[in-house]
UniProtKB/Swiss-Prot annotation:
Residues 112-131 are annotated as: Disordered. It comes from Fowl adenovirus A serotype 1 (strain CELO / Phelps). This is Uncharacterized protein ORF7. It comes from the Viruses.
Amino acid sequence: MNSMVLELRKKMSSGPDCVIGRPPHILPPQKGVYLLTNISQLIGPVQQNDRGLWRHNGMHTQNLSHHFTGPFICAVIARPINKRTHIGIHVLNQNNELPAIFTIQYPEPPHLTDNPGAVRKSQKSLIPPYN
């Protein structure tokens, strides 16, 4: 494992979090690679670069420059935060600096929450007691 990946992992464990809305197109959370489009519009202007790279666990897997409509980012690293509701997006500029960590949260139907019992209880409370 090279020093850049180690440094990235170190930086990934710290930094400010920012909750933003669901991107226009995102694959359902699963093990593997997440595909984002127009991420530059979601996160705002970042340092200009001539291409956008999608990175997962420090390895770049796909050039996504054709998906970008605004200022390009140098690299993106995705890591699952919660198996079903959060993905951490780590944005690097050209100097491999990590200015911020962005958390994407997307809503789910109540029956997919981590605590289905709580949902059942709330549904039961809406039913009047049987006399």
